[in-house]
Swiss-Prot record:
One of the essential components for the initiation of protein synthesis. Protects formylmethionyl-tRNA from spontaneous hydrolysis and promotes its binding to the 30S ribosomal subunits. Also involved in the hydrolysis of GTP during the formation of the 70S ribosomal complex. GO terms for molecular function: GTP binding; GTPase activity; translation initiation factor activity. Keywords: Cytoplasm, GTP-binding, Initiation factor, Nucleotide-binding, Protein biosynthesis. GTP binds at residues 218-225, 264-268, 318-321. Pfam families: EF-G_D2, GTP_EFTU, GTP_EFTU_D2, IF-2, IF2_N. This is Translation initiation factor IF-2. The lineage of its organism: Bacteria, Bacillati, Bacillota, Clostridia, Thermoanaerobacterales. NCBIfam families: IF-2, small_GTP. The gene is infB.
Length: 707
């Protein structure tokens, strides 16, 4: 069995031998009806021989093809000459016809007039005008060729008092135009800013291959940094060994005369934050999983982030040198998450590595190059640069410093750039080794000096004609941003889900589930996904056990999702971030309620009656046993206030363990109505004695929402 396997050849190996790309070979195999999944699939010896023979015969075929082409060209030339002769004959006939028409006198003129009037009548049947978002009454009158006074009369009849030079909006103008029998089209005015940031498609001949941009992700302590260090070490020459490499947030590695760019971003939080800002920089993600630990919560989060971004994934199973390493267990766990390894018949590339012992690093780099080849990454270096800011800071003696990735074109020293609401002129440029450079092509990470302010990570940058133009555009963007802040990007909420479905703005509802136990996560996931119908599909993009974190909120913001919490609470920072990002968090104690709410929202029957208003949070710092009363919690109010008539919930390690009412609220043995933030108090909970130090008491009231 083993001997047989040894004789098998992988697709990418054969491609290398034949000096063609894996992509071309795959298409040839498809034409020959040889079934292979991808470049890692194996081929039988007979299949390899067949392909080699066919490729050897190809030059002969091409020669015959050339001969046929010459014959075809000669035939086409003859046909063209015949066509030209007949064309000139037709033209002579036409001239003769026109002459006779002129000689025909009044009778023919009448016929001619009738013909013209019929044509114009046809044209009058459909009258279409194109108008912008706003225009004056005078401009509308000119477009429709009517008296402006008539339009003013019609507008006054509708209760709109205007003069001839006053502006009216598109809706009002289209109603007036319809009364005159016109069909109205809206004029698409392309904003100058939009036009500059919109990348025009390049011609195929201008595109050149570019290096892939790789992000390394994974759970804490699984060896992300060690792996990046190992990759760099295999690439550092003896000359560079003694020097200090400057950290700019990205590094360039050269393998077999090909470059690969690695982003040194702090894991999936930065990846998602940049995606939320609309920046798609990463071409390939390397997911690091420790062979001894296996799949961990952060690994699952990273997988969900990568799936949501639709980026190719390579799994690096690290720490295989440890005695406790179990790569097969890792592969099993990955398969359960839908990432089936190639050797098990799936599509996920898994490479066993040891960053510490430098094992399998070359294999991993080769796989990265293979995936990059399959992705066919190209860019046009011969145009003004555009790209994305990946890191930015204020440095002493340098001012605002930004690390950018050039995604298209070439960036040069002296170029005027705009990024987000900042602008500047590239005064100096440094590569990933800290060397001063004059220009940077596609996929290259560089540190640039010369911005007016510190741009934000994820901001897109583009080169413009001059600094004056860059300043004008940056000021315009600031104005646009102010307007956007006022009407913040609308996220999905259950209350307006039905309206959005009807308008056609929502075809898919993304949901993140957080619960107290894994069973609840699975139950909710199954129940919600079963609610999908033709109008809206419910997609659970992430489900996990534990409190709602900032990472969950960032994923929800990037994927326009809602968060459903079952028996869990959001962390303080997560709650603040959700308010800022306008992400909806729905909390439930009963699974049925969550399902019914989503179902009702989909049917447009959601009637909000009450909403929870958080009053304050207190931390239990001591527990006192009072005879005849039970346990009383000695608390410190962390934020807000605790009121005597409030409802409360007890939260332990992010999980709700009890809900009830306050039985007593004391301060220095005196009964009080409420205790403000920063003060200590004693709290007794109705019908609950299992209070412990470190518990959080959340006070809230239920407020009726007017309908």
């Amino acid at each position: 069995m083993e001997v047989n396997n040894m004789s098998k050849t992988r697709v990418y190996e054969l491609a290398k031998e034949l000096n063609i790309s894996s992509k071309d070979l795959l298409s040839k195999l498809s034409d020959l009806d040889i079934k292979v999944k991808n470049h890692m699939s194996t081929l039988e010896d007979e299949e390899v021989e067949l392909i080699k023979d066919l490729l050897a015969e190809k030059p002969k075929e091409e020669k015959q093809k050339d001969q046929k082409n010459h014959e075809q060209e000669a035939q086409d030339k003859e046909e063209k000459e015949i066509e030209e002769d007949s064309f000139y004959e037709d033209r002579e006939e036409k001239r003769a016809y026109k002459k006779s028409f002129k000689k025909g006198g009044k009778k023919n003129k009448k016929l001619q007039k009738k013909f013209v009037s019929e044509e114009s009548a046809k044209e009058d049947e459909i009258k279409i005008i194109t108008i912008p978002e706003f225009l004056t009454v005078k401009e509308l009158a000119e477009k429709m060729k009517v008296n402006p006074t008539e339009i003013i009369k019609k507008l006054i009849a509708q209760g709109i008092m205007v003069t001839v030079n006053q502006q009216i909006d598109f809706e009002t103008a289209s109603k007036i135009a319809e009364e005159y029998g016109f069909l109205v089209d809206k004029e698409e005015v392309k904003d100058e800013l939009e036009a500059i940031f919109e990348d025009t498609p390049d011609r195929e001949e201008d595109l050149k291959p570019r290096p892939p941009i790789v992000t390394v992700m994974g759970h804490v302590d699984h060896g992300k940094t060690s792996l990046l260090d190992a990759i760099r070490k295999t690439n550092v020459t003896m000359k560079e060994m003694g020097g200090i490499t400057q950290h700019i947030g990205a590094s360039v590695v050269e393998i077999n005369d090909k470059k690969v760019v690695f982003l040194d971003t702090p894991g999936h939080e930065a990846f998602t934050a940049m995606r939320a800002r609309g920046a798609s920089v990463t071409d390939i993600v390397v997911l690091v999983v420790a062979a001894d630990d296996g799949v961990m919560p952060q690994t699952i989060e990273a997988i969900n982030h990568v799936k949501a971004a639709n980026v190719p994934l390579i799994v690096a199973i690290n720490k295989i040198d440890l005695p406790t390493a179990n790569p097969d267990r890792v592969k099993t766990e990955l398969s359960e998450l839908g990432l089936v390894p190639e050797e098990w018949g799936g599509n996920t590339i898994c490479v066993p590595v040891s960053a510490k012992k430098n094992i399998g690093i070359d294999d991993l780099l080769e796989m990265i190059l293979l995936v990059a080849e399959m992705e066919d990454l190209k860019a046009n270096p011969n145009k003004p640069a555009r790209g994305t800011v990946i890191e930015a800071k204020l440095e002493k003696g340098k001012g605002p410093v930004a690390t950018v990735i050039v995604q298209n074109g070439t960036l040069q020293v002296g170029d005027a750039v705009i990024a987000g609401t900042t602008y500047g002129k590239v005064r100096a440029m440094f590569d990933d080794k800290g060397r001063k450079i004059k220009k940077a092509g596609p996929s290259m990470p560089v540190e640039i000096l010369g911005f007016s302010e510190v741009p934000e990570a994820g901001d897109k940058f583009v080169v413009v004609e001059n600094e004056k133009k860059a300043r004008e555009l940056a000021e315009k963007r600031r104005e646009v941003q102010r307007e956007l802040e006022l009407k913040k990007k609308q996220k999905v909420s259950l209350e307006d889900l039905f309206r959005q479905i009807q308008e056609g703005t929502v075809k898919e509802l993304n949901v993140i589930i957080k619960a107290d136990v894994q069973g609840s996560v699975e139950a909710l996931r199954k129940s919600l996904e079963e609610l999908s119908n033709e109008e809206v599909r419910i997609r659970v993009i992430h489900g996990a056990v534990g409190a709602i974190t900032e990472t969950d909120v960032m994923l929800a913001s990037a994927s326009n999702a809602i968060i459903i919490g079952f028996n869990v609470r959001p962390e303080t920072n997560a709650k603040a971030l959700a308010e800022k990002e306008k992400v909806e968090i729905k909390l439930y104690r009963i699974i049925y309620d969550a399902i019914e709410d989503v179902k009702a929202a989909m049917k447009g029957m959601l009637e909000p009656k009450y909403k929870e208003v958080e009053l304050g949070r207190a931390e239990v710092r001591a527990v006192f046993k009072i005879p005849g009363v039970g346990n009383v919690a000695g608390c410190y109010v962390l934020n807000g206030k605790i009121a005597r008539n409030a409802d409360v919930r007890i939260v332990r390690d992010g999980i709700v363990i009890y809900e009830g009412k306050i039985a007593s609220l004391k301060r220095f043995k005196d009964d009080v109505r409420e205790v403000q933030q920063g003060f200590e108090c004693g709290i007794g909970i109705e019908k609950f004695n299992d209070i412990k130090e470190g518990d959080i008491i959340e006070a809230y009231t239920m407020e009726e929402i007017p309908r």
